[in-house]
Amino acid sequence: MNNLKKLDGKKIALIGGAGFIGHNLAVHLQSLGAKVNIIDGMQVNNLLSLVDNVDNLPYPDLSRAIINERTQILKTAKIHIRVQDARDYHALSRLLNEINPQIIIQLAAVSHANRSNKDPYSTFDHSFRTLENSLDWARSNISSLEQFIFFSSSMVYGNFKKNIVDENEVCDPLGIYGTLKYSGE
């Protein structure tokens, strides 16, 4: 818990942070006193992509309610959402220079396995290119950046051979998504 107290006042950039994990993480970090900025191109796995496709979802009314609730939660928490495609290195760099984060949390990815396998080029671009750009900025700003956190996935382990899996298990990534997460590690 002491490490969490050290987040008070820290500037944190969540790249690809408008999805399910990102918006929840942003709210929690903000509640711990961090100054959170979400950077997201709003193209996959996030609120805006849900809004654009809500009528095609199995439960459109429920989906609308979820979207409205997420939006209200972020608004109430006063979390800044910067709409920026992290695949654009120069634009991302300008935005990160403006924010000057002490911590970067890299969440950007196409996380839906079927979508990832259907369009591997786009998946690579949204998952790996964004990581490359974020790491390149981090390398250039190593004196001010305290931490770079990459969110991976259990997909790097493939089909679990036992109930509990930890970092000592052999990696056997599943599909494009799992392979790109493993490559990112």
State what each model feature region is:
Residues 1-185:
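N-terminal Rossmann-like NAD(P)+-binding domain of SDR-like oxidoreductases, especially those catalyzing
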